[in-house]
Amino acid sequence: MGCVTASIACNHNSVISKEADYPIEVETGPEILTGSTRLKAGTAQKMILNMVSTATMVGIGKGNENLMVDLVRTNEKLEARLCNIVMEAAGCDRARAVQALSEAEGNGKVAIIMILSECGRLKAEEKLKEARGHVRRAVMQT
């Protein structure tokens, strides 16, 4: 098929590792409860997948520094979290973050760019598009 493949195995020299283009092997040793694969091995695999997905999210512009800036507000808790993220990323107070989020129609990335670049929503959206979704690149544009 020509697809690039990756694998995660919790044993050294596993069969799947030999078949994958990018094998990840982490030796967790035997499980405390023989026959179970959900304890050490399952936890290790979950941690690896979390690291891979986090790196991917940052790579495609969903993160800025250590902040998840591409958060969708689906409830009050996430709305408050997004406001806090905008405040931290833009170095502004709550009132300014709320105002920018309102003007940006809830788009945290656009709100951050609006504040840091001192521009309106349309210009911020344009800058974000030109920067391929990356807030830092958008802010650095002149």
Question: What kind of region is each of these model predictions?
Answer:
Residues 51, 56-142:
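Short, amphipathic alpha-helical interaction segments embedded in low-complexity terminal/linker regions
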